[in-house]
Amino acid sequence: MKPLKGETLVSLLISLGLSALLLLLVAQFYAQTQQQNQHLVLQLKLQAELQRTIQLIGKDLRRVGFRAANPKLIEDNLALFELDEKGTAITIAQADNAPSNSCVLFFYDLNSNGCIGEKYTKNTCVNGVKNVAKNIEKELFGYKLNGKMIETKQTYKNVVNADCRSEDCQSALTQSTCNAGGGWTDLLDEKEFEISQLRFDWLKAGKGIEIKLAGHLAAYKHIQYETSLVVPLLNQEE
């Protein structure tokens, strides 16, 4: 009769040790993979939101100075809002104590009625040197950096008198409007996102603007993203 052979205690301990080490390595790999996946998901979330934001701003800026041809309109009010004889319809500035070029103000004919504003009577938007179009605030736009957040101009709040004359109408595009309290609202959720840079730079001959945008997640400041976009201004003269 042959004697039975089995594992020695040392061999058993070695096997158990190797198994435990393997399980530990698998657990560490799984945890690391989960962490990397979470980082990737959060990075993509930030990237998607900032890309959506810069595309939104760019889409608005492409329309700067647009005015539709309205054959029924006797006289429009664009000249009351334009900053010079070239028809300049945009200002780049900054709020007090904010980074340079972090505020942009502009207008365009959103509803394509030929005027800045929605309603007018007798087929004219002016009465002498005064504006008579209503709801002009709906076609006066703006974006700015305020602290760690992008703000957009509230188009339902009137910061310019509806019966404005040229100087008052043009105040919608002056630096003081970048400071106006109560006329701006957050564009993003401040609990989720923080913006570190919003900048608007003129391109050569004023025929375009480069937007620079950078930010991070509020809860994960190490997850960052930056992007830029060049926007042609097709409705502005040189």
Question: At which residue positions do the language-model features occur?
Answer:
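Short linear sequence signals and composition-biased patches located at protein termini or domain-edge surfaces
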Residues: 163-238
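N-terminal pilin/flagellin-like segments and related low-complexity appendage regions
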Residues: 41, 59-187
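Acidic surface patches and DE-rich sequence motifs
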Residues: 3, 84, 217
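Aliphatic-rich helix starts adjacent to a transmembrane/signal segment
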Residues: 3-68
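Generic cytosolic/nucleocytoplasmic N-terminal low-complexity/intrinsically disordered segments
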Residues: 1-4, 143
